[in-house]
Amino acid sequence: MSEWGKMSLFRLSLLLLFAVTPFAAIAAPPALIPIPASTRALEGKFRITERTGVEGKGLAAPTAAYLAKALGLTAGKRNGSRIRLNLVGEKIVPGAEAYRLTVEPDEIRIEASDARGLFYGAQTLRQLVSKSRDGSQVIPAIRIEDSPRFRWRGLLVDVARHFFGKPELLKIIDEMAAYKLNVLKLHLTDYEGWRLEIPGYPKLTEVGALVDGKPRYFTTADMREIVQYAADRHIMVVPEIEMPGHAGAAARAYPEFFNDAGGAFNPANPKAYDFIRSVLSEVARIFPAPYLHFGGDEVGDDVWKGMADVDRLKAEQGLKTTDDVEAYFGRKVVGVIESLGKRALAWDEQVDAKAPKTVVIQWWRRDRPDVLEAAARDGYELVLSPADHLYFDYHQGEGEPGAPWEGNKGGPQSIAKVLAWEPVPDSFTPEQSARVLGIEACAWTEFIETERYLQFMIFPRLLALAEIAWRPKGPRDEAEFSTRLEPHIEALRAKGINARRGEWDAYEFITN
């Protein structure tokens, strides 16, 4: 009998349990993801009743209301047992995003020195809830002290190649919040589509967003709603507007700003920079995040070949190669971004282009560890997204679907492979390690056309990402993690999320 057959009855029982539980963790010790830094079991259980109150004042009130709704309770003081959320001083709970959770039979306390910590403590509490035999919700008595390893715990969703709209993103945001991820990067523009309304440039969406003859994009109102929904869950939404390359959709709309082939901005055209400033100014107004990603990757050597105005620019500025021209363009764009009060992010090709040290570098080229080492040595802050561990368009098992890129030939990008990755190289000095802001997985969608397929590729690898991003550095046991993971997969599926169970026959759920 296959593993699927052996586990089917167990999975069915879990499914029935999760269908009636806000969020369950039924293993002992609790099957928490990500695993906390410190846990200590106490005596007894806390029983949730209709008289249980969820209390939080001031900055704690929003999380108290969120938690009360998740548990089917009413926020505020009641005449029964209580769940208290308190903001305390740094000396009591030190560290940004840290929390202390204490569950006793008559009271639950979540304490943190900032609102984010309270929110993450609430997420851990939700995972501790289970159903007792009499149908009531119970939580084991426990004391947890916890804080994240990395401050950047992200997921990139490519909505340019294939469009995924507000309903799809809100579901992803909910699950990111549940697992303490805090950055959603939206790849909004590429060859296939421009997906954000920009007032004053209607052709960006009228022409650049066409799918089967119909424009598919986010209105500014839709995007503001997504950004606020994420912010309410302590998730920062970072926009990516690709340039100079990966810009075919914008070139179809406004070819006068681009090279002759129509795939990259013309760095010699002053009006192109006016266009960029206008567009990025609007983007900066929509997204309050302090970061703006401008791409800066995969520019071909011949992209500006034979363009007389670019040749003149090279002569005037002393630029000899395509890399030199790209570096010139990048410096101009970084200047625009910084003038808007934002900090620029870019892919790791910008290390080769000698981008200003204020740029945050996102390393993705797993075959170029030398670039990562150079970026660390040169003083850049870093977000790590190596393709061979964190590209969620890569296949998860032998024979399964996935992007057919050259870098996808090192075997399946399984849960085990994700977990095996240690983000910070041993060669990094303490100072260099401190400049690693965190990690970010990338769900590219060239070959992902439906929401069910997208979910299949993201889940449950997203939970392995959360484990690496949050838990302290140290060895990770894939078998132990898989034991904790099992009930979470069933919880996701009970909510309608098409999480992969680990068997190839689950592929039927992509298309059904």
For the regions a protein language model found, what residue spans apply to each?
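Bacterial N-terminal signal peptides that target proteins for export
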Residues: S2-L14
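Bacterial N-terminal signal peptides
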Residues: S13-P22
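Sec/Tat signal peptide C-region and signal peptidase I cleavage site
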Residues: F23-A27
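Contiguous, structured surface segment used for ligand recognition
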Residues: A28-W152, Y453, R461, A469-I497, ...
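Flexible loop/turn segments at secondary-structure boundaries
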Residues: P62, F163-G165, Y191-E197, P244-A250, ...
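Feature activates predominantly on carbohydrate-active enzymes
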Residues: I92-Y291, M307, K332, V336, ...
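Active-site neighborhood of glycoside hydrolase catalytic domains
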Residues: P255-T358, R365-R368, L372-A374
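Flexible, acidic glycine-rich loops studded with aromatic residues
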Residues: A344-E349, K354-V359, R365-N512
